[in-house]
Amino acid sequence: MSKRIIQSVLSVSVLASMMSMAFAAQNEQEQAEQTLEKPAEPVKLETIFVTAEEQVKQSLGVSVITKEDLEKLPVRNDISDYVRRMPGVNLTGNSATGQRGNNRQIDIRGMGPENTLILVDGKPINSRNSVRYGWKGERDTRGDSNWVPAEAIESIEVLRGPAAARYGSGAAGGVVNIITKKVTNETHGSVEFYTSQPEDSKEGSSNRVGFNVSGPLIKDVLSYRLYGNYNKTEADDVDINKSIGSTAAGREGVKNKDISGRLAWQATDQQTVLLDISSSKQGNIYSGDSQLNANAEADAILSQLIGKETNTMYRDSYALTHEGDWSWGKSKLVAQYDKTHNKRLPEGLAGSVEGKINNLDDKATSRLETLRFNGEANIPFEYYLPQVLTVGTEWVEDRFKDNVSTTQGKDSSGSGYGDQLAKGDRSKMESRIASAYIEDNLKVTDSTDVVLGLRFDDHSKSGSNWSPSLNITQKLNDYFTLKGGVAKAYKAPNMYQNAEGYLLSTNGNGCPANIESRCLLQGNGDLKPETSVNKELGIQFQKDIVNASLTWFRNDYKDKIVAGTHVVGTVDGSSTNANTGAVTNTKWNILRWENTPKALIQGFEGSLGLDFGDIRWTNNFTYMMDSKDKQTGNPLSLVPIYTINSIFDYDITDQLDVNFVFTQYGRQKSRQFAENRLESGIGSGGANSALKPSTVKSYSTAGINVGYKFSDQISTRVGVSNLFDKQILRDSNSISQTYNEPGRAYYASLKYSF
């Protein structure tokens, strides 16, 4: 990155800060004068002060989950249980391989979890980046959607397509913004207990307890908020999938511990300072999973680990926020420091044992540190048209150290092929992104709103990127509104893809079909960033009790980063026979991560909501027309061809309510085309190992629950999930049926509020 760019970005940040402070001294006097001389002006200003971000969140590609929604359909542990019910959202892996199938994460519009950005109160979380990135693009992680307990959440915003592009790298599919409960000027709080008990004794149960409390330390000046959570979800039995002849593991368990505090200081009527500190621990309960479905019961090492904690994530976050509400507009400054320690047993890095735990020694720890600064100002004014201008800058720096995943090809003499390909300390990686953005929300007419945006990102290795955007809202009449948008989204290479010291190897089966043996996959510091031109166009109808919409979306995905198929060189290496001690000298073919030309995502989303007051019925659907890597012909991820969600909510009395939920998943087709020698039928397994395309048939799940309020303080809820017991079992011989859908379970919660 050039020094000039860095200096420019930092200069704008400093200037924004100085402007905020300079205007602060004049603010109270100016507001008083405006109130006396022009009393109508503040009211007028308030009515048009809608920022570009707020306006874009009115797009059809945006859904909001409220705290009441989470109370009426409680999640077992992870908010992904509820987010998956939104249009365009599914749970899947980051590729169409089905690897790590039971570690499904939030996928938006088929772009994969790596293109879904998780935010907490608008601040990104990237702890999953500390987990090793596999040959096919998978990580052994549950993602970043489980760092905030449901009890602490005020709402969840799910942004899809063009609406998400403003958030920068990693939001090409969409954004999930978890908004926590605010501090209060009166003491309020709650404690909730939740349990879920499966009918099938081989499935893991779940129990959690959480609390949230907030109140003043100094009335009207200093307030606090504190929340905490403990959850334990047991692992499935190691033999849960044996009934269909599969050795694949079931879902692993998880133990969560979370604590978070906030101090809010109302420094003046115009200025608020927030201090956020949180600490979390997530540990797994091992159930036998490995990247390539090894038989855990037959493996000497894996069989000893069943039921134990093989990986633990520790996450600490510190953030300081200044919010200003001035006579000229609003400002926000954020400084954030996140630290993730990923402690886990070492895994293989070669061929058929990639991703499989290979010893019982002490866990190794990789360390990820992220420093983030963001400054933003929103300025309303009128120049030909009423408008609100947004200007902002951002600086993100990641420093990462992984001593275990960067050891392939290393030997004590320093002459291994890994040592030849990458000199120095291979374990250290880093990344920096400097960004600046400008947006303008224009009120063209009473019925027309236009939001223009332009974002610039400069990455320390992949260079610069410009991301323009346009969103339009046009009211056609009292009932119909046309909404559309187009934006260029962006994703920088991850640190493993960029690191020349990160090597994976295969003796032949994992090589491209045209390479007979011995392939090395090496990180590439010359990768381009991934980009996607995201478009959507839809119509909304609102009248009386009806709210309906239909939206077409299309993502033209370019330069997706994948494992390379072209030999860029060779390197000398050697291997030692463990039985005879004989040394064999070999040559390895070097592949590198590379940008694949194009991919296409396209489909429709629709919704229909009926609100009768005490009765509410909300429905949505997603239909995937296209999901294809144009180079391989395979889908980008494993998602149903269609999904239908329906929630029926009836408040029978002020104390009693009942909820019914139904989801229908369409067929899920696997990859159709081989991508290596083994799948092509020319590897060591011959034709028996050739890729066998498969399909998960359409299926549905349903649930029901009843809630009752004993008083303003005490409430309870009991229910049944997967009411008709449609259980899906993971099949190690299938490349589409790659996950477990749990069967019928009974759950209950008890909440005390004060």
UniProtKB/Swiss-Prot annotation:
Localization: Cell outer membrane
Ranges where the record places region Disordered: 404-424
Annotated SUPFAM superfamilies: Porins (SSF56935)
The UniProt record lists the keyword Transport: yes
TM spans (from-to): none
Keyword set, alphabetical order: Cell outer membrane, Disulfide bond, Ion transport, Iron, Iron transport, Membrane, Porin, Receptor, Signal, TonB box, Transmembrane, Transmembrane beta strand, Transport
InterPro entries assigned: Plug_dom, Plug_dom_sf, TonB-dep_rcpt-like, TonB-dep_rcpt_b-brl, TonB_rcpt_b-brl_sf, TonB_rcpt_CS, TonB_sidphr_rcpt
Predominant place of localization: membrane
GO CC list: cell outer membrane; pore complex
Role noted for this protein: Probably involved in the initial step of iron uptake by binding iron chelating siderophores, thereby allowing extraction of iron from the environment. May bind the siderophore, ferric enterobactin, with micromolar affinity.
Protein name in the entry: Probable TonB-dependent siderophore receptor PirA
Lineage: Bacteria, Pseudomonadati, Pseudomonadota, Gammaproteobacteria, Moraxellales
